[in-house]
Amino acid sequence: MSRQGISLRFPLLLLLLSPSPVLPADPGAPAPVNPCCYYPCQHQGICVRFGLDRYQCDCTRTGYYGPNCTIPEIWTWLRTTLRPSPSFVHFLLTHGRWLWDFVNATFIRDKLMRLVLTVRSNLIPSPPTYNVAHDYISWESFSNVSYYTRILPSVPRDCPTPMGTKGKKQLPDAEFLSRRFLLRRKFIPDPQGTNLMFAFFAQHFTHQFFKTSGKMGPGFTKALGHGVDLGHIYGDNLERQYQLRLFKDGKLKYQMLNGEVYPPSVEEAPVLMHYPRGIPPQSQMAVGQEVFGLLPGLMVYATIWLREHNRVCDLLKAEHPTWGDEQLFQTARLILIGETIKIVIEEYVQQLSGYFLQLKFDPELLFGAQFQYRNRIAMEFNQLYHWHPLMPDSFRVGPQDYSYEQFLFNTSMLVDYGVEALVDAFSRQPAGRIGGGRNIDHHILHVAVDVIKESRELRLQPFNEYRKRFGMKPYTSFQELTGEKEMAAELEELYGDIDALEFYPGLLLEKCHPNSIFGESMIEMGAPFSLKGLLGNPICSPEYWKASTFGGDVGFNLVKTATLKKLVCLNTKTCPYVSFHVPDPHREDRPGVERPPTEL
Protein backbone atom coordinates (compact mmCIF):
# COMPACT_ATOMS: atom_id res chain seq x y z
CA MET A 1 0.00 0.00 0.00
CA SER A 2 1.33 3.43 -0.92
CA ARG A 3 2.21 6.02 1.72
CA GLN A 4 -0.57 8.23 0.34
CA GLY A 5 -3.06 5.41 0.75
CA ILE A 6 -2.07 4.94 4.37
CA SER A 7 -2.40 8.66 5.12
CA LEU A 8 -5.88 8.74 3.53
CA ARG A 9 -7.19 5.61 5.18
CA PHE A 10 -5.76 6.07 8.65
CA PRO A 11 -8.30 8.77 9.68
CA LEU A 12 -11.10 6.60 8.27
CA LEU A 13 -9.95 3.69 10.40
CA LEU A 14 -10.10 5.93 13.46
CA LEU A 15 -13.70 6.80 12.63
CA LEU A 16 -14.60 3.11 12.61
CA LEU A 17 -13.27 2.67 16.13
CA SER A 18 -15.96 2.54 18.78
CA PRO A 19 -16.11 5.48 21.20
CA SER A 20 -14.33 5.19 24.52
CA PRO A 21 -16.26 2.73 26.67
CA VAL A 22 -17.74 3.60 30.03
CA LEU A 23 -15.29 1.90 32.35
CA PRO A 24 -15.48 0.77 35.97
CA ALA A 25 -13.06 2.26 38.41
CA ASP A 26 -10.04 0.41 39.71
CA PRO A 27 -11.42 -2.99 40.79
CA GLY A 28 -9.24 -2.93 43.88
CA ALA A 29 -10.75 0.31 45.13
CA PRO A 30 -13.34 0.28 47.91
CA ALA A 31 -16.73 1.26 46.54
CA PRO A 32 -18.00 3.78 45.89
CA VAL A 33 -14.96 5.85 44.88
CA ASN A 34 -15.29 8.56 42.29
CA PRO A 35 -13.25 7.04 39.43
CA CYS A 36 -12.07 10.48 38.32
CA CYS A 37 -10.11 10.67 41.60
CA TYR A 38 -7.58 8.38 39.91
CA TYR A 39 -7.01 10.91 37.10
CA PRO A 40 -7.33 8.07 34.57
CA CYS A 41 -7.61 10.21 31.43
CA GLN A 42 -4.23 11.08 29.97
CA HIS A 43 -3.02 13.66 27.43
CA GLN A 44 -5.70 16.25 28.29
CA GLY A 45 -8.53 13.75 28.01
CA ILE A 46 -11.58 14.72 30.07
CA CYS A 47 -12.91 12.37 32.74
CA VAL A 48 -16.72 12.13 32.83
CA ARG A 49 -18.29 10.18 35.68
CA PHE A 50 -21.26 7.88 35.07
CA GLY A 51 -23.19 6.46 37.99
CA LEU A 52 -21.12 5.86 41.09
CA ASP A 53 -18.12 3.91 39.88
CA ARG A 54 -17.92 4.27 36.10
CA TYR A 55 -16.22 6.86 33.91
CA GLN A 56 -15.50 7.71 30.31
CA CYS A 57 -12.56 9.62 28.85
CA ASP A 58 -13.33 12.18 26.18
CA CYS A 59 -10.25 12.07 23.94
CA THR A 60 -11.59 14.46 21.30
CA ARG A 61 -8.79 16.29 19.47
CA THR A 62 -6.13 15.16 21.92
CA GLY A 63 -4.26 13.16 19.28
CA TYR A 64 -4.84 10.03 21.35
CA TYR A 65 -7.54 7.37 21.60
CA GLY A 66 -8.34 4.32 23.69
CA PRO A 67 -10.14 3.94 27.02
CA ASN A 68 -7.78 6.34 28.82
CA CYS A 69 -6.51 8.39 25.85
CA THR A 70 -3.17 6.59 25.87
CA ILE A 71 -2.87 5.27 22.30
CA PRO A 72 -1.32 7.88 19.99
CA GLU A 73 -2.52 8.56 16.49
CA ILE A 74 0.25 8.15 13.94
CA TRP A 75 1.07 11.84 13.58
CA THR A 76 0.98 12.29 17.34
CA TRP A 77 3.40 9.39 17.71
CA LEU A 78 5.77 10.89 15.15
CA ARG A 79 5.58 14.32 16.77
CA THR A 80 6.23 13.04 20.30
CA THR A 81 9.01 10.74 19.11
CA LEU A 82 10.86 13.56 17.38
CA ARG A 83 10.19 16.23 20.01
CA PRO A 84 13.23 16.92 22.22
CA SER A 85 12.79 16.99 25.98
CA PRO A 86 12.34 20.35 27.75
CA SER A 87 15.65 19.92 29.55
CA PHE A 88 17.48 19.31 26.26
CA VAL A 89 15.87 22.37 24.66
CA HIS A 90 16.86 24.47 27.68
CA PHE A 91 20.43 23.18 27.40
CA LEU A 92 20.59 24.13 23.72
CA LEU A 93 19.21 27.62 24.36
CA THR A 94 21.67 28.32 27.18
CA HIS A 95 24.87 27.00 25.56
CA GLY A 96 26.88 27.85 22.46
CA ARG A 97 26.77 31.63 22.52
CA TRP A 98 28.69 31.93 19.24
CA LEU A 99 26.00 29.92 17.44
CA TRP A 100 23.19 32.02 18.91
CA ASP A 101 25.00 35.24 17.99
CA PHE A 102 24.78 34.03 14.40
CA VAL A 103 21.13 32.98 14.74
CA ASN A 104 20.14 36.32 16.27
CA ALA A 105 21.56 38.15 13.25
CA THR A 106 19.57 36.14 10.68
CA PHE A 107 15.99 35.35 9.66
CA ILE A 108 16.24 32.19 11.76
CA ARG A 109 15.58 34.28 14.85
CA ASP A 110 12.10 35.21 13.60
CA LYS A 111 11.35 31.59 12.68
CA LEU A 112 12.35 30.36 16.13
CA MET A 113 10.48 33.17 17.87
CA ARG A 114 7.29 32.32 15.98
CA LEU A 115 7.74 28.66 16.96
CA VAL A 116 8.26 29.58 20.62
CA LEU A 117 5.16 31.78 20.68
CA THR A 118 2.84 29.29 18.97
CA VAL A 119 4.01 26.19 20.82
CA ARG A 120 3.83 27.89 24.22
CA SER A 121 0.53 29.69 23.62
CA ASN A 122 -1.20 26.56 22.33
CA LEU A 123 -0.86 25.02 25.79
CA ILE A 124 -3.33 27.56 27.21
CA PRO A 125 -7.00 26.83 26.43
CA SER A 126 -8.87 29.64 24.72
CA PRO A 127 -11.70 30.32 25.37
CA PRO A 128 -11.33 29.51 29.10
CA THR A 129 -12.67 26.23 30.43
CA TYR A 130 -13.08 25.80 34.20
CA ASN A 131 -13.24 27.93 37.33
CA VAL A 132 -13.49 27.45 41.09
CA ALA A 133 -17.23 26.74 40.91
CA HIS A 134 -17.40 24.73 37.69
CA ASP A 135 -15.25 21.67 36.96
CA TYR A 136 -16.98 21.23 33.62
CA ILE A 137 -17.52 23.40 30.55
CA SER A 138 -20.20 26.00 31.31
CA TRP A 139 -21.38 29.33 30.01
CA GLU A 140 -20.63 30.83 33.41
CA SER A 141 -16.97 29.81 33.13
CA PHE A 142 -16.77 31.57 29.79
CA SER A 143 -18.79 34.70 30.43
CA ASN A 144 -18.19 35.63 34.07
CA VAL A 145 -14.86 37.46 34.16
CA SER A 146 -15.06 37.83 37.94
CA TYR A 147 -13.60 34.32 38.15
CA TYR A 148 -10.02 33.29 37.60
CA THR A 149 -10.05 30.48 35.08
CA ARG A 150 -8.28 27.23 35.88
CA ILE A 151 -6.31 24.88 33.65
CA LEU A 152 -7.24 21.62 35.38
CA PRO A 153 -10.52 20.94 37.19
CA SER A 154 -10.32 20.66 40.95
CA VAL A 155 -9.76 17.47 42.89
CA PRO A 156 -13.24 15.93 43.30
CA ARG A 157 -14.65 16.52 46.78
CA ASP A 158 -15.44 12.85 47.40
CA CYS A 159 -11.93 11.47 46.85
CA PRO A 160 -10.31 9.19 49.47
CA THR A 161 -7.39 11.61 49.99
CA PRO A 162 -7.03 15.39 49.59
CA MET A 163 -5.00 14.90 46.40
CA GLY A 164 -7.14 12.15 44.85
CA THR A 165 -6.24 8.59 45.79
CA LYS A 166 -2.50 8.92 46.48
CA GLY A 167 -0.81 10.15 49.61
CA LYS A 168 -2.00 10.54 53.16
CA LYS A 169 -5.50 11.38 54.29
CA GLN A 170 -4.27 14.61 55.84
CA LEU A 171 -1.90 17.07 54.21
CA PRO A 172 1.06 18.40 56.22
CA ASP A 173 0.56 21.58 58.21
CA ALA A 174 1.15 24.52 55.86
CA GLU A 175 3.14 26.52 58.40
CA PHE A 176 5.36 23.57 59.31
CA LEU A 177 5.89 22.81 55.62
CA SER A 178 6.91 26.39 54.89
CA ARG A 179 9.26 26.67 57.85
CA ARG A 180 10.90 23.33 57.12
CA PHE A 181 11.39 23.65 53.37
CA LEU A 182 10.91 27.28 52.29
CA LEU A 183 12.35 29.39 55.13
CA ARG A 184 15.73 30.94 54.31
CA ARG A 185 18.73 29.73 56.29
CA LYS A 186 21.20 31.85 54.34
CA PHE A 187 20.53 34.17 51.41
CA ILE A 188 21.04 32.35 48.10
CA PRO A 189 21.56 34.85 45.26
CA ASP A 190 20.21 34.11 41.83
CA PRO A 191 23.10 32.63 39.79
CA GLN A 192 21.77 34.43 36.68
CA GLY A 193 22.48 37.81 38.29
CA THR A 194 18.89 38.99 38.65
CA ASN A 195 18.55 42.11 40.80
CA LEU A 196 15.96 43.95 42.90
CA MET A 197 15.04 46.18 39.97
CA PHE A 198 13.74 42.99 38.37
CA ALA A 199 12.04 41.84 41.57
CA PHE A 200 10.13 45.09 42.02
CA PHE A 201 9.22 45.15 38.32
CA ALA A 202 7.77 41.64 38.71
CA GLN A 203 5.63 42.76 41.64
CA HIS A 204 4.56 46.02 40.03
CA PHE A 205 3.76 44.45 36.65
CA THR A 206 1.82 41.40 37.88
CA HIS A 207 -0.33 43.31 40.37
CA GLN A 208 -2.35 44.70 37.48
CA PHE A 209 -3.85 41.23 36.82
CA PHE A 210 -3.33 39.36 40.10
CA LYS A 211 -5.94 41.02 42.33
CA THR A 212 -7.69 38.27 44.24
CA SER A 213 -11.01 39.38 45.70
CA GLY A 214 -10.91 39.27 49.49
CA LYS A 215 -14.70 39.38 49.72
CA MET A 216 -15.55 36.75 47.10
CA GLY A 217 -12.71 34.32 47.82
CA PRO A 218 -9.49 33.03 46.23
CA GLY A 219 -11.18 31.93 43.00
CA PHE A 220 -12.28 35.46 42.16
CA THR A 221 -10.45 38.52 40.85
CA LYS A 222 -11.01 42.27 40.88
CA ALA A 223 -8.78 42.72 37.81
CA LEU A 224 -11.47 42.22 35.20
CA GLY A 225 -9.15 43.15 32.31
CA HIS A 226 -7.33 39.79 32.74
CA GLY A 227 -4.09 40.99 31.23
CA VAL A 228 -1.83 43.93 30.48
CA ASP A 229 -4.34 46.78 30.75
CA LEU A 230 -2.19 48.92 33.09
CA GLY A 231 -4.92 48.97 35.71
CA HIS A 232 -2.11 49.32 38.26
CA ILE A 233 -1.36 52.73 36.71
CA TYR A 234 -4.84 53.93 35.77
CA GLY A 235 -7.01 52.06 38.26
CA ASP A 236 -9.15 48.96 37.76
CA ASN A 237 -12.41 50.88 37.40
CA LEU A 238 -13.61 54.11 35.82
CA GLU A 239 -14.27 55.90 39.10
CA ARG A 240 -10.69 55.38 40.28
CA GLN A 241 -9.34 56.36 36.87
CA TYR A 242 -11.26 59.64 36.93
CA GLN A 243 -9.90 60.50 40.38
CA LEU A 244 -6.34 60.00 39.10
CA ARG A 245 -6.75 61.98 35.89
CA LEU A 246 -5.98 65.67 35.48
CA PHE A 247 -8.48 66.03 32.61
CA LYS A 248 -6.14 68.36 30.82
CA ASP A 249 -4.02 67.36 27.82
CA GLY A 250 -4.64 63.68 28.63
CA LYS A 251 -2.41 63.76 31.69
CA LEU A 252 -2.56 62.15 35.11
CA LYS A 253 -2.53 64.17 38.33
CA TYR A 254 0.86 64.74 39.94
CA GLN A 255 2.61 66.79 42.59
CA MET A 256 5.97 68.56 42.50
CA LEU A 257 8.38 67.70 45.31
CA ASN A 258 12.00 68.88 45.30
CA GLY A 259 11.48 69.98 41.72
CA GLU A 260 10.46 66.48 40.57
CA VAL A 261 7.16 64.92 39.49
CA TYR A 262 5.62 62.36 41.86
CA PRO A 263 2.17 60.76 42.21
CA PRO A 264 -0.40 63.03 43.87
CA SER A 265 -1.37 62.67 47.51
CA VAL A 266 -4.71 61.11 48.40
CA GLU A 267 -5.82 64.62 49.34
CA GLU A 268 -5.46 65.65 45.70
CA ALA A 269 -6.65 62.32 44.28
CA PRO A 270 -9.06 60.82 46.83
CA VAL A 271 -8.75 57.10 46.09
CA LEU A 272 -8.45 54.20 48.52
CA MET A 273 -4.83 53.37 49.33
CA HIS A 274 -3.74 50.78 51.88
CA TYR A 275 -1.47 52.52 54.36
CA PRO A 276 -1.13 51.89 58.10
CA ARG A 277 -3.11 54.07 60.44
CA GLY A 278 -1.25 57.14 61.52
CA ILE A 279 0.19 58.02 58.11
CA PRO A 280 -1.40 61.39 57.22
CA PRO A 281 -3.22 61.73 53.87
CA GLN A 282 -0.67 64.23 52.56
CA SER A 283 2.03 61.55 52.94
CA GLN A 284 0.01 58.88 51.12
CA MET A 285 0.62 58.78 47.38
CA ALA A 286 -2.35 57.92 45.15
CA VAL A 287 -1.75 55.50 42.26
CA GLY A 288 -3.73 52.92 40.28
CA GLN A 289 -3.00 49.96 42.58
CA GLU A 290 -4.11 50.42 46.17
CA VAL A 291 -1.31 48.31 47.73
CA PHE A 292 1.70 50.01 46.14
CA GLY A 293 2.39 52.11 49.22
CA LEU A 294 3.74 48.93 50.81
CA LEU A 295 7.18 49.10 49.19
CA PRO A 296 9.27 52.04 47.95
CA GLY A 297 10.32 49.81 45.04
CA LEU A 298 6.73 49.62 43.82
CA MET A 299 6.24 53.36 44.20
CA VAL A 300 9.44 53.97 42.19
CA TYR A 301 7.86 52.21 39.23
CA ALA A 302 4.54 53.97 39.82
CA THR A 303 6.37 57.30 39.66
CA ILE A 304 8.32 56.38 36.52
CA TRP A 305 5.20 55.27 34.65
CA LEU A 306 3.32 58.40 35.74
CA ARG A 307 6.10 60.56 34.31
CA GLU A 308 6.16 58.46 31.14
CA HIS A 309 2.43 58.82 30.60
CA ASN A 310 2.58 62.59 30.92
CA ARG A 311 5.70 62.75 28.72
CA VAL A 312 3.93 60.75 26.00
CA CYS A 313 0.92 63.06 26.27
CA ASP A 314 3.19 66.05 25.57
CA LEU A 315 4.58 64.30 22.48
CA LEU A 316 1.10 63.43 21.22
CA LYS A 317 -0.16 66.95 21.89
CA ALA A 318 2.66 68.36 19.76
CA GLU A 319 1.75 65.97 16.94
CA HIS A 320 -2.01 66.42 17.25
CA PRO A 321 -2.87 69.89 18.58
CA THR A 322 -6.56 69.35 17.72
CA TRP A 323 -6.94 66.28 19.92
CA GLY A 324 -8.93 66.58 23.12
CA ASP A 325 -8.07 65.29 26.58
CA GLU A 326 -9.82 61.94 26.15
CA GLN A 327 -8.11 60.97 22.91
CA LEU A 328 -4.71 62.01 24.24
CA PHE A 329 -5.26 59.98 27.41
CA GLN A 330 -6.52 56.86 25.63
CA THR A 331 -3.78 56.89 23.00
CA ALA A 332 -1.07 57.42 25.62
CA ARG A 333 -2.45 54.44 27.51
CA LEU A 334 -2.18 52.23 24.42
CA ILE A 335 1.39 53.39 23.88
CA LEU A 336 2.32 52.56 27.48
CA ILE A 337 0.70 49.12 27.13
CA GLY A 338 2.89 48.53 24.08
CA GLU A 339 6.01 49.79 25.85
CA THR A 340 5.26 47.48 28.78
CA ILE A 341 4.89 44.38 26.60
CA LYS A 342 8.07 45.24 24.68
CA ILE A 343 10.10 45.60 27.88
CA VAL A 344 8.59 42.47 29.42
CA ILE A 345 9.37 40.21 26.46
CA GLU A 346 12.75 41.55 25.38
CA GLU A 347 14.28 42.31 28.78
CA TYR A 348 12.24 40.85 31.65
CA VAL A 349 11.51 37.42 30.13
CA GLN A 350 14.94 37.44 28.50
CA GLN A 351 16.57 37.83 31.92
CA LEU A 352 14.39 35.11 33.42
CA SER A 353 15.07 32.61 30.65
CA GLY A 354 18.84 32.90 30.52
CA TYR A 355 18.54 32.05 26.81
CA PHE A 356 21.14 33.09 24.25
CA LEU A 357 18.31 33.31 21.71
CA GLN A 358 17.42 37.00 21.69
CA LEU A 359 13.67 37.22 22.29
CA LYS A 360 11.71 39.59 20.09
CA PHE A 361 8.45 41.48 20.44
CA ASP A 362 6.90 41.53 16.99
CA PRO A 363 3.15 40.84 16.83
CA GLU A 364 3.37 40.41 13.06
CA LEU A 365 5.09 37.06 13.62
CA LEU A 366 1.68 35.62 14.55
CA PHE A 367 -0.46 37.27 11.89
CA GLY A 368 -0.39 34.14 9.74
CA ALA A 369 -1.14 31.79 12.63
CA GLN A 370 -4.38 30.78 14.30
CA PHE A 371 -4.41 32.93 17.43
CA GLN A 372 -7.07 34.41 19.71
CA TYR A 373 -6.51 37.96 20.96
CA ARG A 374 -8.06 37.62 24.36
CA ASN A 375 -6.86 36.28 27.69
CA ARG A 376 -8.15 35.01 31.01
CA ILE A 377 -5.88 34.85 34.05
CA ALA A 378 -5.64 31.38 35.59
CA MET A 379 -5.51 30.68 39.31
CA GLU A 380 -2.54 28.38 38.67
CA PHE A 381 -0.65 31.32 37.13
CA ASN A 382 -1.45 33.38 40.21
CA GLN A 383 -0.19 30.61 42.48
CA LEU A 384 2.95 30.07 40.41
CA TYR A 385 3.94 33.74 40.44
CA HIS A 386 4.54 34.07 44.19
CA TRP A 387 8.27 34.63 43.80
CA HIS A 388 9.04 35.88 47.29
CA PRO A 389 12.48 34.18 47.37
CA LEU A 390 13.59 37.13 45.20
CA MET A 391 13.45 39.41 48.24
CA PRO A 392 16.75 39.94 50.13
CA ASP A 393 17.48 39.95 53.86
CA SER A 394 17.64 43.75 53.83
CA PHE A 395 17.55 46.60 51.32
CA ARG A 396 20.73 48.51 50.56
CA VAL A 397 20.43 52.12 49.44
CA GLY A 398 23.72 53.96 49.25
CA PRO A 399 25.75 53.20 52.38
CA GLN A 400 22.74 52.17 54.47
CA ASP A 401 20.96 48.84 54.91
CA TYR A 402 17.24 49.05 55.61
CA SER A 403 15.50 46.26 57.49
CA TYR A 404 12.01 45.15 56.53
CA GLU A 405 10.62 47.16 59.42
CA GLN A 406 12.35 50.28 58.08
CA PHE A 407 11.54 49.60 54.42
CA LEU A 408 7.87 48.60 54.44
CA PHE A 409 5.48 51.56 54.13
CA ASN A 410 8.43 53.96 54.12
CA THR A 411 6.70 57.05 52.73
CA SER A 412 9.73 59.35 52.77
CA MET A 413 12.44 57.24 51.11
CA LEU A 414 11.28 57.85 47.53
CA VAL A 415 11.33 61.63 47.81
CA ASP A 416 14.37 61.78 50.11
CA TYR A 417 16.60 59.73 47.78
CA GLY A 418 14.87 60.43 44.46
CA VAL A 419 14.06 58.00 41.66
CA GLU A 420 17.61 57.91 40.25
CA ALA A 421 19.30 56.88 43.48
CA LEU A 422 16.76 54.15 44.22
CA VAL A 423 16.90 52.76 40.67
CA ASP A 424 20.68 52.67 40.88
CA ALA A 425 20.58 50.92 44.26
CA PHE A 426 17.96 48.36 43.25
CA SER A 427 19.80 47.60 39.99
CA ARG A 428 22.98 46.80 41.91
CA GLN A 429 21.54 44.60 44.67
CA PRO A 430 21.22 40.87 43.85
CA ALA A 431 17.85 39.16 44.15
CA GLY A 432 17.41 35.69 45.55
CA ARG A 433 17.15 32.39 43.70
CA ILE A 434 13.50 31.35 43.35
CA GLY A 435 13.75 27.57 42.99
CA GLY A 436 15.42 24.92 45.10
CA GLY A 437 13.71 25.80 48.38
CA ARG A 438 14.79 27.41 51.65
CA ASN A 439 15.20 30.96 50.39
CA ILE A 440 12.20 32.99 51.65
CA ASP A 441 12.99 35.60 54.30
CA HIS A 442 11.17 35.06 57.59
CA HIS A 443 9.42 38.43 57.34
CA ILE A 444 7.42 37.28 54.30
CA LEU A 445 7.19 33.53 54.92
CA HIS A 446 3.53 33.99 55.87
CA VAL A 447 2.79 34.66 52.18
CA ALA A 448 3.94 31.16 51.24
CA VAL A 449 1.82 29.72 54.05
CA ASP A 450 -1.22 31.55 52.71
CA VAL A 451 -0.53 30.38 49.15
CA ILE A 452 -0.46 26.74 50.26
CA LYS A 453 -3.66 27.17 52.26
CA GLU A 454 -5.31 28.88 49.30
CA SER A 455 -4.33 26.06 46.94
CA ARG A 456 -6.03 23.61 49.29
CA GLU A 457 -9.16 25.71 49.36
CA LEU A 458 -9.09 25.76 45.55
CA ARG A 459 -8.39 21.99 45.53
CA LEU A 460 -5.61 22.18 42.95
CA GLN A 461 -4.61 18.85 41.46
CA PRO A 462 -1.20 17.35 42.35
CA PHE A 463 2.02 18.80 40.97
CA ASN A 464 2.63 15.77 38.75
CA GLU A 465 -0.76 16.19 37.05
CA TYR A 466 0.26 19.71 36.07
CA ARG A 467 3.60 18.45 34.76
CA LYS A 468 1.72 16.06 32.49
CA ARG A 469 -0.69 18.80 31.41
CA PHE A 470 2.22 20.96 30.26
CA GLY A 471 3.98 18.18 28.37
CA MET A 472 6.50 17.02 30.98
CA LYS A 473 7.05 13.58 32.43
CA PRO A 474 5.80 13.15 36.01
CA TYR A 475 8.43 12.70 38.67
CA THR A 476 8.73 9.17 40.02
CA SER A 477 10.31 10.05 43.37
CA PHE A 478 10.96 12.99 45.66
CA GLN A 479 14.69 12.52 45.12
CA GLU A 480 14.21 12.99 41.38
CA LEU A 481 12.30 16.20 42.18
CA THR A 482 14.78 17.75 44.60
CA GLY A 483 18.04 16.25 43.36
CA GLU A 484 19.12 15.40 46.91
CA LYS A 485 18.30 12.83 49.59
CA GLU A 486 17.65 14.63 52.89
CA MET A 487 14.83 16.90 51.78
CA ALA A 488 13.40 14.11 49.63
CA ALA A 489 13.16 11.75 52.59
CA GLU A 490 11.37 14.36 54.71
CA LEU A 491 8.90 15.12 51.92
CA GLU A 492 8.26 11.40 51.48
CA GLU A 493 7.45 11.16 55.17
CA LEU A 494 5.04 14.10 55.03
CA TYR A 495 3.23 13.38 51.75
CA GLY A 496 3.60 9.62 51.42
CA ASP A 497 3.68 9.65 47.63
CA ILE A 498 5.26 11.87 44.95
CA ASP A 499 1.88 11.87 43.17
CA ALA A 500 0.37 13.62 46.21
CA LEU A 501 2.81 16.55 46.22
CA GLU A 502 1.05 19.92 46.05
CA PHE A 503 1.42 22.40 43.19
CA TYR A 504 3.20 25.34 44.85
CA PRO A 505 5.63 23.33 47.03
CA GLY A 506 6.51 21.29 43.95
CA LEU A 507 7.40 24.41 41.98
CA LEU A 508 9.58 25.93 44.70
CA LEU A 509 11.30 22.71 45.81
CA GLU A 510 12.15 21.39 42.35
CA LYS A 511 15.87 21.32 41.64
CA CYS A 512 17.03 24.25 39.54
CA HIS A 513 18.55 24.01 36.10
CA PRO A 514 22.35 24.51 36.34
CA ASN A 515 23.11 28.19 36.97
CA SER A 516 19.41 29.01 36.71
CA ILE A 517 16.92 30.91 38.86
CA PHE A 518 14.47 28.00 39.00
CA GLY A 519 13.67 24.55 37.65
CA GLU A 520 12.07 23.00 34.61
CA SER A 521 8.45 23.15 35.75
CA MET A 522 8.40 26.88 36.49
CA ILE A 523 9.66 27.57 32.96
CA GLU A 524 7.43 25.07 31.17
CA MET A 525 4.29 26.18 33.03
CA GLY A 526 5.02 29.88 33.43
CA ALA A 527 6.10 30.63 29.86
CA PRO A 528 2.81 29.61 28.19
CA PHE A 529 0.76 31.73 30.60
CA SER A 530 3.08 34.71 30.11
CA LEU A 531 3.38 34.63 26.34
CA LYS A 532 -0.32 33.96 25.76
CA GLY A 533 -1.21 36.87 28.02
CA LEU A 534 1.26 39.24 26.39
CA LEU A 535 0.65 38.42 22.72
CA GLY A 536 -3.07 37.91 23.34
CA ASN A 537 -3.38 41.61 24.13
CA PRO A 538 -5.62 43.38 21.59
CA ILE A 539 -2.87 45.86 20.64
CA CYS A 540 -1.00 42.87 19.15
CA SER A 541 -3.88 42.01 16.81
CA PRO A 542 -3.85 42.88 13.08
CA GLU A 543 -6.68 45.37 13.69
CA TYR A 544 -4.76 47.32 16.34
CA TRP A 545 -1.08 46.87 15.40
CA LYS A 546 -0.72 49.86 13.08
CA ALA A 547 0.64 53.38 13.39
CA SER A 548 -2.77 55.07 13.55
CA THR A 549 -3.62 53.21 16.77
CA PHE A 550 -0.72 54.93 18.51
CA GLY A 551 -1.17 58.40 17.08
CA GLY A 552 1.07 57.95 14.05
CA ASP A 553 4.71 57.01 13.53
CA VAL A 554 5.91 58.95 16.58
CA GLY A 555 3.76 56.92 18.97
CA PHE A 556 4.32 53.66 17.09
CA ASN A 557 8.09 54.13 17.30
CA LEU A 558 7.83 54.74 21.05
CA VAL A 559 6.40 51.23 21.35
CA LYS A 560 8.81 49.59 18.92
CA THR A 561 11.93 51.09 20.51
CA ALA A 562 10.98 50.95 24.19
CA THR A 563 13.60 49.75 26.67
CA LEU A 564 13.93 49.80 30.44
CA LYS A 565 16.79 52.29 30.17
CA LYS A 566 14.72 54.65 28.02
CA LEU A 567 11.79 54.36 30.38
CA VAL A 568 13.92 55.49 33.31
CA CYS A 569 16.40 57.88 31.72
CA LEU A 570 13.89 59.87 29.67
CA ASN A 571 12.01 60.57 32.88
CA THR A 572 14.89 61.53 35.17
CA LYS A 573 17.38 64.39 35.23
CA THR A 574 20.33 62.01 35.43
CA CYS A 575 20.69 58.48 34.09
CA PRO A 576 21.46 55.88 36.77
CA TYR A 577 22.70 52.36 36.22
CA VAL A 578 19.47 50.62 35.24
CA SER A 579 19.09 46.97 34.30
CA PHE A 580 17.41 43.74 35.36
CA HIS A 581 20.91 42.32 35.88
CA VAL A 582 23.49 43.30 38.48
CA PRO A 583 26.56 45.07 37.06
CA ASP A 584 29.23 42.89 35.52
CA PRO A 585 31.93 42.61 38.22
CA HIS A 586 34.62 42.19 35.55
CA ARG A 587 33.95 45.63 34.13
CA GLU A 588 35.11 48.84 35.75
CA ASP A 589 32.23 50.13 37.85
CA ARG A 590 30.65 53.23 36.42
CA PRO A 591 29.55 56.27 38.42
CA GLY A 592 26.25 55.94 40.21
CA VAL A 593 24.43 58.32 37.89
CA GLU A 594 25.12 59.85 34.50
CA ARG A 595 23.55 62.59 32.49
CA PRO A 596 21.12 61.04 30.00
CA PRO A 597 22.03 61.36 26.35
CA THR A 598 19.68 63.33 24.14
CA GLU A 599 18.93 60.14 22.18
CA LEU A 600 18.56 56.81 23.96
From Swiss-Prot:
GO terms for biological process: cyclooxygenase pathway; response to oxidative stress. Coiled coil: none annotated. Binds 1 heme b (iron(II)-protoporphyrin IX) group per subunit. Its cofactor is heme b. Residues 32-70 form the EGF-like domain. Disulfide bonds join 36-47, 37-159, 41-57, 59-69, 569-575. It is an enzyme of class 1 (oxidoreductase). Glycans are attached at residues 68, 104, 144, 410. Pathway: Lipid metabolism; prostaglandin biosynthesis. Homodimer. Residues 1-24 form the signal peptide. It catalyses: (5Z,8Z,11Z,14Z)-eicosatetraenoate + AH2 + 2 O2 = prostaglandin H2 + A + H2O; (5Z,8Z,11Z,14Z)-eicosatetraenoate + 2 O2 = prostaglandin G2; prostaglandin G2 + AH2 = prostaglandin H2 + A + H2O; (9Z,12Z)-octadecadienoate + AH2 + O2 = (9R)-hydroxy-(10E,12Z)-octadecadienoate + A + H2O. This is Prostaglandin G/H synthase 1. The cyclooxygenase activity is inhibited by nonsteroidal anti-inflammatory drugs (NSAIDs) including ibuprofen, flurbiprofen, ketoprofen, naproxen, flurbiprofen, anirolac, fenclofenac and diclofenac. It holds the Pfam family An_peroxidase. GO terms for cellular component: cytoplasm; endoplasmic reticulum membrane; neuron projection.
